[in-house]
């Protein structure tokens, strides 16, 4: 039997509510030459019946006897995949019709790229928002230092990069498995994002999308592993300053505002001193953007926030237009407290 060029890999656990919509999005793809590998991770709801009713010959359903977890199901799917390209799919998201066609064309034209994501439309909380992530390999690497930069359900992965380097998902993680994999896979291949929304990403009211204490338990060790590339043994104060900047944490002490600004400069200097393991231009842009986001949270400190930001050399590189600068200044002048909206 000929191998299909693409394996669409979708684990599902008790996903009856949105499963059919996710499946229909894949079956409606303009690129038709794929196998659709569905791993039913021991579902106890109506998921097995829905999967059994699917008639498309491209669909293969593998059922786990027990609930093994997302990472284990994904690793199982990677072992079973026949396609040279693995397209990730989640059972509650929706792939737009041209997704596979555009990603396959990009991967075929860029042999050095091992992972390709896309933009996404975030929906499900009563409003829609476009998510844009950096497109180039350099910009993606700069953002990975602070957090995830590829939407998991938009990712297409070259299977050979995984198998040749003995890579897979960390089964000890309950979430952030994708962020962890991207940081490890980036040591072996280039990364890219198509700057076009080709996936609809569903946000759940009670999910762990975004920043929550539960998710931070898994994300923080990944962030600190990235930090140790520049600073092998960071102090507790340095870790605190770093996480404040990564997560745009609202701090209570005015001194912590200055600490975050000083920390951003320190990271820039460390990257230069270490021979630029992170691409200089893109890392500077990412640092300045995160510093602006952090300072913007602290306009209730008044002109202190404005002066600290302005004194920072990074302010000149911050991705903000004149209108944003004026609004930031006005909020500092008025000591606007965003937490009281």
Describe each model-derived feature in a short phrase.
Residues 4-7, 35, 180:
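Cell-envelope/extracellular polymer assembly enzymes that use nucleotide-activated donors
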Residues 24-33:
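Short, acidic, metal-binding catalytic loop of nucleotide-sugar glycosyltransferases
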Residues 40-49, 66, 90:
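A conserved acidic beta->alpha catalytic loop
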Residues 64-81, 102:
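Glycine-rich, basic loop-to-helix element that forms the pyrophosphate-binding segment
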Residues 71, 79, 118, 137-245:
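Conserved nucleotide-sugar donor-binding catalytic segment
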Residues 86:
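Short aromatic/hydrophobic "clamp" motif used to bind/position activated sugar donors
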Residues 98-130:
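Conserved donor NDP-sugar-binding/catalytic core segment of glycosyltransferases
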Residues 203-341:
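C-terminal subregions of glycosyltransferases and related glycan-biosynthesis enzymes
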